[in-house]
């Protein structure tokens, strides 16, 4: 896939050198009230370097594709598209310094159109029902909530899972 250039952004396959900006996104996210609703990411430099190198390598196939979203030279967010039996599941994260400016919608709209142009007609996403900004973003992209599930990524002080309501969203073209 060639780079996608929107009005304000450049979207390209994730490169191993993107690790610094992605680490910054993960450090930023770990301080967010929404961090409790997502799988924790290691922010150790070596761990991040290795993980992003794997992402860059994986992006050479259609099963798992990772995209960096740039404003100028800065990676302000990323998106993942992971093949499922009947479509792709998407994931995304953006540095909070760039929230509320439409960058997520602009970049994800462009990526969804690119995949649609390659014959993909169904997309899935999951987010916590309490993550209002993410739910609002998915809705603005045309996703519909098709279900909910109890999800847990963390345990309490007694080792018991802490559950939250996760929404399952779907977009069909």
Show the residue positions of the predicted features.
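Acyl-donor (CoA/ACP) binding surface of acyl/acetyltransferases
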Residues: 1-32, 66-173
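Conserved GNAT-fold acetyl-CoA-binding loop/helix
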Residues: 30-54
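Short, conserved alpha-helical segments within structured domains
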Residues: 40-44, 65, 130
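A short helix-loop-beta-strand connector motif used in the catalytic cores of GNAT acetyltransferases and
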Residues: 53-67, 77
């Amino acid at each position: 896939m060639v780079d996608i250039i929107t009005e304000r952004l450049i979207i390209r396959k994730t490169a191993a050198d993107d690790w610094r900006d992605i680490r910054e996104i993960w450090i930023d996210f770990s301080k967010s009230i929404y961090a409790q609703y997502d799988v924790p990411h290691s922010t150790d430099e070596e761990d991040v370097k290795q993980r992003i190198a794997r992402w860059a390598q994986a992006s050479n196939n259609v099963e798992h594709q990772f995209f960096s979203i740039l404003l100028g030279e800065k990676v302000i967010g990323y998106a993942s598209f992971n093949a499922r039996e009947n479509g792709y599941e998407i994931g995304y994260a953006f540095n909070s310094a760039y929230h509320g400016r439409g960058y997520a919608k602009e970049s994800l709209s462009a990526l969804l159109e690119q995949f649609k142009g390659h014959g993909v007609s169904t997309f899935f996403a999951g987010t916590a029902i309490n993550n209002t900004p993410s739910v609002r973003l998915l809705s603005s992209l045309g996703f519909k909530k098709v279900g909910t599930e109890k999800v847990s990524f963390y345990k309490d002080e007694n080792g018991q899972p802490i559950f939250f309501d996760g929404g399952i969203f779907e977009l069909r073209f």
